[in-house]
Amino acid sequence: MIKIAVLGYGTVGSGVVEVIEKNHDSINKKAADDIEIKYVLDLRDFPGDPVEKVLVHDYNVILNDPEVSIVVETMGGLHPAYEFTKQALEAGKNVCTSNKELVAEYGTELVRIAEKKDINYLFEASCGGGIPIIRPLNSSLTADEIDEIDGILNGTTNYILTKMAVDGLDFDEALKEAQQNGYAERNPEADIEGYDACRKIAILSSLAYGAHVDYRDIYTEGITKITATDIKYAQSLGASIKLLATSKKVHDGFYAMVSPVMINAHNPLYSVQGVFNAIFIHGNVLGDAMFYGSGAGKLPTASAVVADVVDCAKHLHKHIIMNWSSRPLKLMDIENVRNRFFVRMEGCMAQEIVRVNSVFGDVESFSVPGITGEFAFITEKMPEHEFREGITQLKGIRSTIRVGF
């Protein structure tokens, strides 16, 4: 029998308990052993909940119990999750987590400890919720050199942008609805400013490229400046606006960024709606592949965590090699990355386009019926720094968004 402990009985932790209880027989068959939850750690009490039978408030009870071989960390945040995880690994216990903040910050260190102890630190649920992506990167795609990852990695922002596009809501209205429906936190900053997606693309890039990508080095821009008018312009082009997390190999370098991007129907991420996530990967042998599914939520995330528990159970005394070196990967300066740009500008298109062309060369200019006093244009591909320099020469700029077609 394999005994596990769950740290945290919140949304994901309670989901882990539920999944193990609900699918107990099939999980045990796949693990080739019986998996039993011996402890659940939480500061709170849960009167009337069956979890009370295994509930403890002192982490040392778990740490000092030699029967516990797998620890499931679903506490979230950096502290004390980091200290508890490190102590568990150093004590020879496998750890599975859904905590992207912890993995992005301390992943290299924790993977190294697990390697030295010949145990495992697994984090499938940290990047795509219920979407299997870490395991494919680490095993199924090992024959490939990955040269591009593009993802919709945050369900909250995708839900907001979908509501703006489908229902014509402005940003604040869509955010409020997301909060009312439980898709956004009371403090949504990590989601809407792109920080959550940034940590996830850092983890995926580290595994894909075999070196450590520091999330602090990734250019990150959220969706708070996207307006209902921006959405209307995109729709007039047969396009949609998505918060994309991207990392890409360019010649001998790599870049990574998170930002709103206008994409059209030729992009496989175009049709990803609501709280769903999707991750597009290009390999030099495989070509294109896309992973799609529920990117968040209690049971989808718990499903990925329990899959890691089963993996740990099958490799109790053997470390699963992770292609994640502690060697830092130096990213390209984002100012040298080339993109096309959508620009909304005040004024009459017929009068202003000569000035625009004098700055950016020939552009694709257009207007949308019903929107007055402004027009829009799309530039050719150019380095980010050239665009920033050019845009300062024009007055009345209302919006700028990168274009992926």
Where are the regions a protein language model picked out?
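N-terminal glycine-/serine-/threonine-rich beta1-alpha1-beta2 phosphate-ribose binding loop
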Residues: 1-90
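Rossmann-like NAD(P)H-binding beta-loop-alpha module
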Residues: 68, 115-196, 203
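Structural motif
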Residues: 7, 73-75, 98, 105, ...
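A conserved regulatory-domain signal marking ACT and ACT-like small-molecule sensing domains
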Residues: 309-405
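ATP-dependent carboxylate/acyl-activation modules
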Residues: 268-323, 330-336
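A short hydrophobic/small-residue beta-strand
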Residues: 94-96
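Substrate-binding/catalytic subdomain of NAD(P)-dependent oxidoreductase enzymes
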Residues: 175-271, 276-278
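Rossmann-fold NAD(P)-binding glycine/threonine-rich loop
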Residues: 81-87, 91, 100-138
